Amino acid sequence: MAIARFPSLVIDCPDAAELARFYGTMLDWKITVSPNWAEIRADYGDCICFQQVEDYTPPQWPGQQVPQQTHLDVNVDDLDAAEAAVLELGATKHEHQPGTSFRVFLDPAGHPFCLCVD
């Protein structure tokens, strides 16, 4: 029997509502916003939370001066279509692209994330 369940992942950021809108729109999950906190939730229950942090410093990937501590990989059917959609939402395509079956982007708070195909 499991000791715990995986209820949510919490990501620090400078603007919780903005980052929730970015990922909520990308994943088509329900967005809930409160002061300094926001979350997105899938219909099947998975949740990602966003915690507003003063003096937030974005990670610098692939360097390690300010290392990433986590990043999201999301699966897509069409890399080109998904790239256009996340760029329109406010993502930035990272200059370092180390693979061919995925693409690396930065969310509006500077966290790396990948769009991946099988």
Q: How does the language model describe each region?
A:
Residues A2-I3, P7-V53, A81-V104:
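Core segments of cupin and vicinal oxygen chelate
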Residues D55-W61:
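A short, acidic/glycine-rich surface segment
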Residues D107:
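Short, acidic, Ser/Thr-enriched surface-loop or helix-capping motifs
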Residues E39-I40, W61-Q64:
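Short secondary-structure boundary/capping segments
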Residues L115-D118:
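Short hydrophobic/aromatic patches at helix-to-coil boundaries
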Residues Q64-V86:
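Mid-chain, well-packed structural core segment of small domains
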